[in-house]
């Protein structure tokens, strides 16, 4: 492991939106894998902690998030996935978050989103960005191999269940989730896929997801899951919401989305959720950071919103 000084210098470099050299990126992913392999499918997290939703390569908005919420390690953070794709700076964004994880392993929790996947990143931007910035796909491979080790969910003080997408008809209990083999590419279907792809819905019961993966689940499903597992709340990301956060399903579920003006055109606010020492909840909303000069991108990503 490198010294803290080495990591601090890398983080300082990354905070200026400068990618690491390829070899350092590989070393960083190796270091992170050694940490993540020891973490759980349901990773326990203590409060206080600040919970964050999708980032999607919007690097300068991530810096704004830290300005609003506090820098690590002064603030503990839990990120619920989707660090890459869509935005212009997936490389710098995911590298910074992984570097912070390696430097402050007990203060930063990074979960897997549906975009932390080989297949999705080949379509929605991260793969092409790696080719553009490094001239080859090696860095893409280092990170997508690392993504297989990211925890699927987290549990704050045994009360607030955090994950990227939503529930699964195959998973009634947290112990069911703990029993999954997560170290693999995100499957096209099944319980692991559902955790990263499902959405809450106004209709009761389970429904077919319009996304083509995962399910929709009703208030009755969320309430039963929370009751069965002694939970007070499901916190998830995965869906853009105009105010940055949205309560639903009789406050059994909250969606947090942390990419303001998503895709640089949606005009939405972003939010993060502070969980205090006594489990008190406080939302901090923020607008986009000032626009930077947009990098030249030769290949446009598809418009379909995943």
From Swiss-Prot:
Cofactor(s) the record lists: Mn(2+)
Alphabetized SMART domains for the sequence: PP2Ac
Broad enzyme group: hydrolase
Alphabetized UniProt keyword annotations: Cytoplasm, Hydrolase, Manganese, Metal-binding, Protein phosphatase
Q: How is the cofactor bound?
A: Binds 2 manganese ions per subunit.
Known InterPro entries for this protein?
Calcineurin-like_PHP_ApaH, Metallo-depent_PP-like, PPA2-like, Ser/Thr-sp_prot-phosphatase
Where does this polypeptide localize?
A: Cytoplasm
- Top-level taxon: Eukaryota
SUPFAM superfamilies registered for this protein in UniProt: Metallo-dependent phosphatases
Query: For binding Mn(2+) 2, which residues are annotated in this chain's numbering?
Result: 82, 114, 164, 238
User: Which tissues and organs express this gene's product?
Assistant: Expressed at the same level in latex as in leaves.
Query: Catalytic residues per the record?
Result: 115 (proton donor)
Q: Which reaction does it catalyse?
A: O-phospho-L-seryl-[protein] + H2O = L-seryl-[protein] + phosphate; O-phospho-L-threonyl-[protein] + H2O = L-threonyl-[protein] + phosphate
Q: Which residues bind Mn(2+) 1?
A: 54, 56, 82
Output the Pfam families linked to this UniProt entry.
Metallophos
Q: Which GO terms describe its cellular component?
A: cytoplasm
* Family from the record: Belongs to the PPP phosphatase family. PP-2A subfamily.
Report what the protein is called: Serine/threonine-protein phosphatase PP2A catalytic subunit
**Gene from which this protein is expressed:** PP2A
């Amino acid at each position: 492991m490198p010294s803290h000084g080495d990591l601090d210098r890398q983080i300082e470099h990354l905070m200026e939106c400068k990618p690491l050299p390829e070899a350092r990126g590989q070393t960083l992913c190796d270091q992170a894998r050694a940490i993540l392999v020891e973490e759980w499918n349901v990773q326990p997290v203590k409060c206080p902690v600040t919970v964050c939703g999708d980032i999607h390569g919007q690097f300068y908005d991530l810096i704004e998030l830290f300005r609003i919420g506090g820098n690590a390690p002064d603030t503990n953070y839990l990120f619920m996935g989707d660090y890459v794709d869509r935005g212009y700076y997936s490389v710098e964004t995911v590298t910074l978050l992984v570097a912070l994880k390696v430097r402050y392993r007990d203060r930063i929790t990074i979960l897997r989103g549906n975009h932390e996947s080989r297949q999705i990143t080949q379509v929605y931007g991260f793969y092409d960005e790696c080719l553009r910035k490094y001239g080859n796909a090696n860095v893409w491979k280092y990170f997508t191999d690392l993504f297989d080790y990211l925890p699927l969910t987290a549990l704050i003080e045994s009360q607030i269940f955090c994950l990227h997408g939503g529930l699964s008809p195959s998973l009634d209990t947290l112990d069911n989730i703990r029993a999954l083999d997560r170290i693999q590419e995100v499957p096209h279907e099944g319980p692991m896929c559902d955790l990263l792809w499902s959405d809450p819905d106004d209709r009761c019961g389970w429904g077919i997801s319009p996304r083509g993966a995962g399910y929709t689940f009703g208030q009755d499903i969320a309430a039963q899951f929370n009751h069965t597992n002694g939970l007070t709340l499901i916190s998830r990301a995965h869906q853009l919401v105009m105010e940055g956060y949205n309560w639903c399903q009789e406050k059994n579920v909250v969606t947090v989305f942390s990419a303001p003006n998503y895709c640089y055109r949606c005009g939405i606010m972003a939010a993060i959720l502070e969980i205090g020492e006594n489990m008190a909840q406080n939302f901090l909303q923020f607008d986009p950071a000032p626009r930077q000069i947009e990098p030249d991108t030769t290949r446009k990503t598809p418009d379909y919103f995943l």
